[in-house]
Amino acid sequence: MRCVVLFMVSCLLIVLLINHFEEVEAQKWKECNLRDIFPGKCEHDANAKLRCKEDIAKNFRPSRPFECDCQTFDQGRICYCKKCLV
């Protein structure tokens, strides 16, 4: 009987902890729409998006950008990110 109660309490604690971490994780991501202009051109590969993510992260601290994209124009490239960890 004691083992059953301990098992049930353990399961309840695990469920509560998992639920708490899911709520905390959901609150961290915010829509941020960060944009900035940088020198150079976009290469159409994963490196261009990563470079944009790194460049915007340097300019907009403490936000950590996510879902970034790059567009080339005459004077350089426009980087924009849709979501951020704050």
UniProtKB/Swiss-Prot annotation:
Annotated S-S bridges: C32-C84, C42-C70, C52-C79, C68-C81
List, alphabetically, the Pfam families matched: SCRL (PF06876)
The entry's keywords: Disulfide bond, Secreted, Self-incompatibility, Signal
GO BP term (any one):
rejection of self pollen
The terms describing its cellular component in GO are: extracellular region
Q: Which InterPro entries does this one have?
A: SCRL
Q: Give compartment(s).
A: Secreted
The signal sequence is 1-26
- Function per UniProt: Involved in male-mediated self-incompatibility.
The family annotation for this protein states: Belongs to the DEFL family.
| The protein, known as | Defensin-like SRCA-homolog protein
Q: Which gene encodes it?
A: SCR37
